[in-house]
Design a protein with these regions (language model features):
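Glycine-rich phosphate-binding loop of ATP-dependent small-molecule kinases
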Residues: 1-214
């Protein structure tokens, strides 16, 4: 059984690699956001508690996140393991899971330099009407600044503006550095395998690096 955590900054290609890893290991992809939405939709006592917390604008506690993860891992599709995309997000959540005897086998961090992330994300352009995506360097439109099909102007989303990307990267580093330290210690103690891969490689190159370690 493989219970895998996948970490990486926004724009590192986690979603693509998560899908490839899930296919390779025959495990479901699990995200904290999905679990919170499913809990609220279920109408359970825990779901109602989560709904009230989210409505108030507060953060869901590490204990509740831990309970949701523990419950999710008992479902039949997790028989071969699971892949957590982007979570746990804090050392508090990681410690809570360890205290609940939830065992992870692999923690993977996709590393990409900040300047490369900014280049990747700030180069994105989108056609608002259709959602068609372009990149000024990697997938440019035929006519700069305009959608190939409609000829209408493309926009840059707020989330993709360099100053916004840098803020998000700052938050990621603040949260993740203590988390990677936590899992490095667990790896050194033999509880799991923690490794970093170079996310600046091609999609297939990154996946090859990951699959060799699994």
């Amino acid at each position: 059984m493989k219970n895998i955590i996948l970490l990486g900054p926004p724009g590192a290609g986690k979603g693509t690699q998560a899908d490839l890893i899930c296919d390779l290991c025959n495990v479901p992809k699990i995200s904290t956001g999905d679990m919170l939405r499913e809990a609220v939709a279920s109408g359970s006592a825990l779901g109602n508690e989560v709904s009230n917390i989210l409505d108030s604008g507060a953060l869901v506690s590490d204990e509740i996140i831990g309970s949701l993860i523990k419950e999710r891992l008992t479902m039949p599709d997790c028989e071969n393991g699971s892949l957590f995309d982007g979570g746990p997000r804090t050392t508090g959540q990681a410690q809570q899971l360890a205290d609940m005897n939830i065992k992870f086998t692999h923690v993977i961090e996709i590393h990409v330099d900040d300047q490369d992330i900014v280049k990747r994300m700030s180069g994105r352009r989108v056609h608002p009407g259709s959602g068609r995506n372009y990149h000024i360097e990697y997938n440019p439109p035929e006519n700069e600044g305009y959608d190939d099909i409609s000829g209408e102007p493309l926009i840059q989303r707020e989330d993709d503006k360099p100053e916004t990307v840098l803020k998000r990267l700052g938050v990621y580093h603040d949260q993740t550095k203590p988390l990677t330290d936590f899992y490095t210690k667990q790896s050194e103690a033999g509880f799991l395998k923690f490794f970093r891969v170079d996310g600046s490689n091609t999609v297939s190159g990154v996946f090859e690096s990951i699959s060799k370690q699994l």
